[in-house]
Amino acid sequence: MRKSTIVFAAVLALQAQAHPSRPPRPGVSTPGVRIPMKKLTPDAVYTIGGAPDWMAIDDETWVSNGPKNMVARMDPKSTTFVTVPVGKEPCSGLAAGFGSLWVPNCGDSTITRVGLKDGKVQATFPLTIADSEGGVAVGAGSFWILTDTHGTLARVDPDTNKVVAEIYVPPGSFAVAFGEGAIWVTSTERSVVTRVNQYTNLVEASIPVGPKPRFITVGEGGVWTLNQGDGSVSRIDPKTNKVSATIDVGVPGGGGEISAGEGSVWVTAMEYPLTRIDPSTNRVVQQFAGDGGDSVRAGHGWVWLTHLRTGLVWRLDPRRIEATR
């Protein structure tokens, strides 16, 4: 996902002066893997408007929209959606659990809870957010979020919306995921993944991965990180706490996202909106090149892909993706 959802030209100009240009994105060079994005046909298109970004999947799929200070709930059986106002500038991921959609808001340092069934705001409570480009998680009876750049992982009780534990992980940690019986946190600054015990809140392992890991997902037999330093993906074996594969995806630089599900691992980045990795071989088997992309989620029989710059969200049948050549 992109660093900020603010789209005013003056702000973008200031960002261009403050940050170096994105490194070239070569993609993969394996013959037969690269496919023009225009060949990929979505099963449904949701015209969200604004800048649809972070997503979460429950019975329906949710997407945040920072410029509009809202989230949208998309019906997976049609192209309809409803919008829900939340806090200022929703950012840094979405998570669905305990009857709620959990929405971090960078503009006012709050968390908004939205009812998954009725789409109504249940609560809004103050909590700092480490970075606008990160990720949150639900699992082990809690909501998890990084709250500062020093590496503070907060565990929130969904019954009280109160922080009940703070776990100290490496600095520059911004994204967290839950799965395989543990909490997993990427440190972009230290290029490691921290494994946290869900019962004791203690750090169990620190696992070196590729350079500058940011986004993380659990599924398809592994823990996977998208490494912004060189555009690679690291696969961690949760049984050994070691990297079992490093996959060159060719998408270095900021933004992007990764999701495991529907038999594949999916990566999105500007210029290469969708890349599919086969977890049985740890190889990139398809890479779609062209415009679009920014956030990806897989689940309940679909792959969901945001097109940040055009305000669209695509719903895709993974079988249709695999058949596209």
Model-predicted regions and their roles:
Residues 5-15:
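Bacterial N-terminal signal peptides
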Residues 15-325:
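Predominantly soluble domains enriched in secretory-pathway, periplasmic, or organellar proteins
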